[in-house]
Amino acid sequence: MRNNNLTVHQSDERMFFLERLLLKTSFDVPTHVFAPNINVDVSVLADIEDGARVVLGKCTDEARALAESRDITLYNIMKDERFQAVNSRLTAEGALMLMIEHSVKSISDCNVLVLGFGRMGAAIAKLLNKLDISLDVATTSSLRPAYAFANHVLPMRDFDFSPYDIIINTVPLAVVNDSDLTTMQKGAVYIDLASKPAVNLEYARYLGADADIYPALPAKTCPYSAAKAMQEYISEVIK
């Protein structure tokens, strides 16, 4: 909906709250905001005014070229360090909620494996460590930082999932093969937080795992806080 040159493109509850947070903010040129997980393409950008400003998280190369030709300024929220830090923390909290909802055990009784130790994986490991949850990390990154939170740091290959009640993936690559999946406990909880799953989800479910992918998790678990993080970014970069 439009307000004072602002269009917040509605795609989830987070964007509803963002519109409310920006209700009294005026913009001197047409300004459009898309959810960070929406990949903006040429067909979407074609409807936006020349000279407009667009806040987004992803766009195609063709859309980027079209924006340049029409003097449309793109602001990529996913390149902002502060926003990424907040978004990772909110994602970690959402992952904890999923763990509690899906596990038949108390999380204090669970052995957890986190795949990946980038910004999101580190945020999850830090939160689980604070709760004194038994945790291992698999990563291709430097091992030393992960050892601050994990009992063991493992290579990102030849997985043996048998010790783990919960597996959380943050790597947007198919790093787990079907043979590795057969080591997973029946009834294990697999939470994929990446844009693309690391495993064959259908096969994992066939083997008895509670497996699913949860993109844009903060928009579902804490939509107001996710919107507030976006609002703070917009207020900072668009004066």
Label each PLM-derived region with a short phrase.
Residues N4-N5, D28-P30, N111, S134-D136, ...:
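Residues at the starts of beta-strands that form the adenosine-phosphate
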Residues L127, T139-L143, T170-V175:
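Active-site rim beta-loop-alpha module in soluble metabolic enzymes
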Residues D12-M15, N37-V40, K58-R64, A138-R144, ...:
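Short, polar loop motifs at secondary-structure junctions
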Residues N37-G51, Y147-K220:
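Rossmann-like adenosine-cofactor binding region
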Residues F27-D28, L131-F149:
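NAD(P)-binding Rossmann-fold cofactor-contacting core
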Residues N4-L22, S108-N129:
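Glycine-rich adenosine-cofactor-binding loop
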Residues K58-Y75, L193-I238:
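Rossmann-fold NAD(P)-binding glycine/threonine-rich loop
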Residues F34-A35, N39-S108, Y233:
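Glycine/serine-rich phosphate-binding loop and adjoining beta1-alpha1 elements at the start
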